[in-house]
Amino acid sequence: NICSRRGLSERFDSTIGAGSVLMPFGGKYQLTPQQNMVAKVPTLHKDTDTATVMAFGYNPKLSAKNPYMGALYAVVDSVTRAVAAGADYKDIYLTFQEYFERLGVDPKRWGKPLSALLGAYTAQEKLGLAAIGGKDSMSGSFNDIDVPPTLVSFAVAPLSASHAVSSEFKGTDNLVFMLSPKYDENNMPDFESLKVLYDMLYMMMRDDKVNLINSAWAIGYGGAAEAICKMSLGNKIGFEFTDCCDKSELFKAKYGSVIIEVKGLGATGFMGNDINVTKLGHTMAEPCIKICGENIPLDDIEKAWTAPLEGVFATKAECENAGMKKFEYGERINIRPKITFAKPRVFIPAFPGTNCEYDSAKAFERAGADADVRIFRYLKPSHIAESIDSFADAIDKAQIIMFPGGFSGGDEPDGSGKFIKAAFENEKVRTAVMELLNNRDGLILGICNGFQALIKLGLVPYGEIRKAESNSPTLTFNTIGRHMSRLAATRIASVKSPWLAGVEVGDIHQIAISHGEGRFVASPETIAEM
């Protein structure tokens, strides 16, 4: 249960809304899985530092053996993960997802959800936290197969985006400690000790002057060993355990314990009688993990971690042409607009299924433009006619058209951007677009689904709306055969476009991508012409 699931995670959009604070996988190499989701609260015209954190907890093996302890630790795990990201535990609210076998009239079966609910309630009562809402199902049986007793706890809290803490190691020669609450003989945490630990972590993360904690990991199923390995992978920063490290302790699931990476701080800086502090070791430049005289290369750890599900949720594609031709076009075209405006007007058409018109408008407003978002309505024929007139009017008043991304028309029929294409091929709209380009030196930009529309309309690469031919350029399915959502290192190959006036050929930028059809295909002649 601790192997890599990156191939599955990348199928889901992690950047939509332009509010993500933490990506699902952290570090330069995007290999350290984050234990929580942190995103800014969406705002239309202003920016904010207010964010929310959401984390979950559940151990199916523990819950199958002891539903009470499984649910109790689900709550503890979810809360600890949220605290490790920078949340104040007192601000946390919980919600539960319960799933149990069909109960029937068997008292033992009825005892499982009752036991789990008592365990969750015990943790809530001890921590002073309430659960709001949730969902339950008692139909998890098929013939003689039953689901394990399931109570998944979700912890949700507000926090400052600027104080959010991610999980990957940030630097070398930093000390790494494990902070643990006290446990009784049944491995039950002392909740008073746990609350002291939570308060201490929050105080250390909030202190801007000291900035003690570089990274943090809430220990779970795989113990400290899992934590150290995964924290090392994101930036390929090595780790050396202390000489007195007890290997047997490293694989224990110490729910409620947190591993922290600190800089320039001795253990005395946060020792107390109410929690246990263990120095695990220090980070180092050498990309390996050293323990008891043994060196384990991080590359070997990465291979072992990614191998189990690679055949199911692939992260690498088999390509016939592994080499990629390098294109460069360094000559700039110095074009000045015929008409200048203090605040350019940007028309952003919103279609059914598009989903980033708000953040596109916000980005343009931040850059000094006025955004005009108009919705294409299609419930009745009269609505379509009104939308066509509205779009043509908006284009006549604009200097820029911005096509937003998403899934216009549900990417039907059989392809992306066709709904946008159909609307902009209308004679009124097409005439307005070409007048903007040819007579007013207008600009057009497209992202995701909107870029698909630019290509299908012929605006890229021809600069005019034209009918597609059999050899027209297109965007087609990713070689890996699935949706991709991650940050991609993208090299600037040309500065011919006015949109690239602020960059140079060869510059590399980390660009958020999220698409299933991201592969540009064109004939050699078209490529040469471009």
Language-model features: locations:
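Intein/HINT protein-splicing elements and their conserved insertion hotspots or analogous self-processing inserts
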Residues: 1-51, 55-63, 108, 113-114, ...
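Short, surface-exposed beta-edge/turn micro-motifs
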Residues: 173-175, 255-258, 398, 487, ...
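Short phosphate-binding/catalytic loops that engage adenosine nucleotides
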Residues: 87, 275, 369
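Short hydrophobic/aromatic beta-strand micro-patches
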Residues: 259-263
